[in-house]
């Protein structure tokens, strides 16, 4: 008797009996192919597409904060005055982690109270030699000469302001107060603010670096952008690096820029002084409390009321941190974009600042810096906004901590890797292989 409804006998197909184990062998081959593809996938540059996973909280002891060591321009853990003090790793020059990255604790920033010819030749090679710490008393170059001796309780770390009096507002005092501020110039004209994070590296926003056939230079140690000073240096830019995920527009309107960050590598390193000093980068896992008072510094809009630029000398303005959810809600009402679309994402941070026309910094990448126990951290860089005349809309800064791994990868000289496919695509590909294996 034939099977009901012409059903095939198990183990046989319309063309005859199946070969035992053929389907299983084909499935195994497909799975091996999938494993090979996963092994060959290029590594994703950290900090460009995904948010780094937060490390677990540790109440006791608190993990050390990660800081720039100005003498070398590399990441290292070290001590600082006050409650942020940590233990230095054993032995001089010890790097943290496999690539020199040290674990960072949760930094909760509290509320705060309120012309000479520029040298264009590279400095002496001995001056440019990398420095290393010697115990806790001083620094030496690679030749063994003592360059500077410091007290053990006053080690020279990043984020040190060299002007303690906040009432002084003259240009020279402003340079000492914000020694990491540099002017990024294209073909001799100021276009954006930059932030010194190492002797040969400047951080800025990507939308200032999108021009072609431009000669970039960086002016450091000067409060003016239209003249030099005895403390200033103009250094040509050797290399421009823009985050490969940068998008000038995230949506169909003016709202938002994505991954608006870039790096400038200088042709030679700057010599540190009280007018030239790097700022600290916050750790991967840190918190800036809502309503905390921070500072925006820079030169403002490059062209205001027909006058270029808005300010010739360095300016500063205090702003307060705005809750991200409130900021996102405001922009949904302001732009009429669907509430299903998230406008303010984890790579952004909002600030409350009224009367921005007086100091309009919306398109020139001015930094947002916050102080904790006397140490200054680069929290954000001005990315986008609706315009300084619409002061009711908060300015949106790129959140620097999100891009800390990307910055370190570029500074450590790792090759630029292609972005890896998302987990969703990998899962879909795996399901497709399983379906093919059952045929």
Curated annotation (Swiss-Prot):
Keywords: Disulfide bond, Glycoprotein, Hydrolase, Membrane, Protease, Signal, Threonine protease, Transmembrane, Transmembrane helix. SMART domains: Tryp_SPc (SM00020). Disulfide bonds join 192-208, 294-370, 327-350, 360-388. The keyword Cytoplasm does not apply. The active site is at 207 (charge relay system), 260 (charge relay system), 364 (charge relay system). Residues 1-47 form the signal peptide. It is found in: Membrane. Residues 51-61 have a biased composition (Basic residues). Residues 1-22, 48-130 are annotated as: Disordered. Its main location: membrane. The chain crosses the membrane at residues 416-436. It comes from the Eukaryota. Residues 157-412 form the Peptidase S1 domain. InterPro entries: Peptidase_S1_PA, Peptidase_S1_PA_chymotrypsin, Peptidase_S1A, Trypsin_dom. Residues 48-415 are extracellular. GO terms for molecular function: serine-type endopeptidase activity; threonine-type endopeptidase activity. Residues 9-21, 112-127 have a biased composition (Low complexity). Its EC number is 3.4.25.-. Residues 437-439 are cytoplasmic. GO terms for biological process: proteolysis. Glycans are attached at residues 116, 187, 226. It is a single-pass type I membrane protein. May be involved in proteolysis through its threonine endopeptidase activity. Belongs to the peptidase S1 family. This is Probable threonine protease PRSS50. The lineage of its organism: Eukaryota, Metazoa, Chordata, Craniata, Vertebrata.
